[in-house]
Swiss-Prot record:
This is tRNA-dihydrouridine(20/20a) synthase. Its EC number is 1.3.1.-, 1.3.1.91. The record marks N96, K182, R185, R298, R301 as: Interacts with tRNA. It catalyses: 5,6-dihydrouridine(20) in tRNA + NADP(+) = uridine(20) in tRNA + NADPH + H(+); 5,6-dihydrouridine(20) in tRNA + NAD(+) = uridine(20) in tRNA + NADH + H(+); 5,6-dihydrouridine(20a) in tRNA + NADP(+) = uridine(20a) in tRNA + NADPH + H(+); 5,6-dihydrouridine(20a) in tRNA + NAD(+) = uridine(20a) in tRNA + NADH + H(+). Catalyzes the synthesis of 5,6-dihydrouridine (D), a modified base found in the D-loop of most tRNAs, via the reduction of the C5-C6 double bond in target uridines. Specifically modifies U20 and U20a in tRNAs. The lineage of its organism: Bacteria, Pseudomonadati, Pseudomonadota, Gammaproteobacteria, Pasteurellales. Keywords: Flavoprotein, FMN, NADP, Oxidoreductase, RNA-binding, tRNA processing, tRNA-binding. FMN binds at P17, M18, L19, Q69, K138, H170, N210, G211, G212, G232, R233. It holds the Pfam family Dus. PANTHER family: FMN-LINKED OXIDOREDUCTASES SUPERFAMILY PROTEIN. The keyword tRNA processing applies. InterPro entries: Aldolase_TIM, DUS-like_FMN-bd, DUS_fam, DusA, tRNA_hU_synthase_CS.
Length: 327
């Protein structure tokens, strides 16, 4: 069902933060499909921002609105990083309280922080002291045996009391041991109703739902109960879905953007990046799924995969790959 009036809540639709996937090049590509989608960075640790020589916060203003997802649990460091991010032009700071990987746990951030609501509250409070942009939290519905609805409500209430007004809830619990991050995205069952109930019990908070969402119809169903939906792998693997988002979820007067249009709009960006020494493959690897289910999609993927990594590969590789796709 197409909405009858514009909807402009910043987080009504967002693309999830995904490690190694939602790079600045990926976000720039996704922005060609949708002007309203909220895009997230990969998770960036506080240490990487404070100590690393590499600029982990580089992005183009044309990507906005973009949220920076931070990984960390030291309130002072998080506040420092949030301040830097706001100065750099990010529109939201998001704290990762959902990733269950061993590496993340060893750094004392991610899903394990659900068991430390007081610390999460301190982190949120410290960041909000330093920035005027929204500070949000992405979390799960529980961890290990701490998976009762009461536990979830207590966590949300405590973090809200510290000033957090927006939550993104992955509708699965996380197992902190015994499952890989991939398995934690698939094996724990989805419990959308629990997330709906959380929104009913905290109507004054803005809440988005995440986990297993793949179609516009599913998004519209969730939006009957939630303020926003967050989509991860489906948006990356089938980015043509993003071309319908503005019209279907924000403003019915917005045009649908086709994959070919989005790819062609990338040409100036690709040339700019090449001139700065960026390898073609670093940009176009995020574009392989652009024509999923279209005639010529396999040839598009194959040609890019076989040629974009070659020395001296330029825009002509993308143009040639595009010639295999039906107009």
């Amino acid at each position: 069902m197409i909405q009858n009036q514009p909807h402009f809540y910043r987080g009504r639709f967002s693309v999830a933060p995904m490690l190694d996937w939602t790079t600045r090049h990926c976000r720039y590509f996704h922005r060609q499909f949708s002007q309203h989608a909220l895009l997230y960075t990969e998770m960036v640790t506080t240490g990487a921002i404070i100590h690393a020589k590499y600029d982990h916060l580089e992005f183009s203003p044309a990507e906005n609105p973009v949220a920076l997802q931070l990984g960390g649990s030291d309130p002072t460091q998080l506040a420092q990083c949030a301040k830097i991010a706001q100065q750099r032009g990010y529109t939201e700071i998001n704290l990762n309280v959902g990733c269950p990987s061993d590496r993340v746990q060893n750094g004392m951030f991610g899903a394990c922080l659900m068991a430390k609501a007081d610390l999460v509250a301190d982190c949120v409070s410290a960041m909000q002291t330093e920035v005027s942009i929204p500070v949000t939290v992405k979390t799960r519905i529980g961890i290990d045996d701490l998976d009762s609805y009461e536990f979830l409500c207590e966590f949300v209430q405590k973090v809200h009391e510290a000033g957090c007004q927006e939550f993104i809830i992955h509708a699965r619990k996380a197992w902190l041991s015994g499952l890989s991050p991939k398995e934690n995205r698939e094996i724990p069952p989805l419990d959308y109703e629990r997330v709906y109930q959380l929104k009913r019990d905290f109507p004054h908070l803005l809440m988005s739902i995440n986990g297993g969402i793949k179609t516009l119809e599913e998004m519209q169903q969730h939006l009957q109960y939630m303020d926003g939906v967050m989509v991860g792998r489906e948006a990356y693997q089938n980015p043509s879905l993003l071309g319908y988002i503005d019209q279907a979820l924000f403003d019915p007067t917005c045009p649908v953007v086709t994959p070919r249009e989005a790819v062609e709009k990338m040409f100036p960006y690709i040339e700019q990046q090449l001139s700065q020494g960026v390898y073609l493959n670093h940009v176009v690897r995020h574009m392989l799924g652009a024509f999923q289910s279209c005639k010529g999609a396999r040839q598009w993927r194959r040609y890019l995969s076989e040629n974009a990594h070659k020395a001296g590969a330029g825009l002509e590789v993308v143009e040639k790959a595009l010639s295999f796709v039906a107009s």
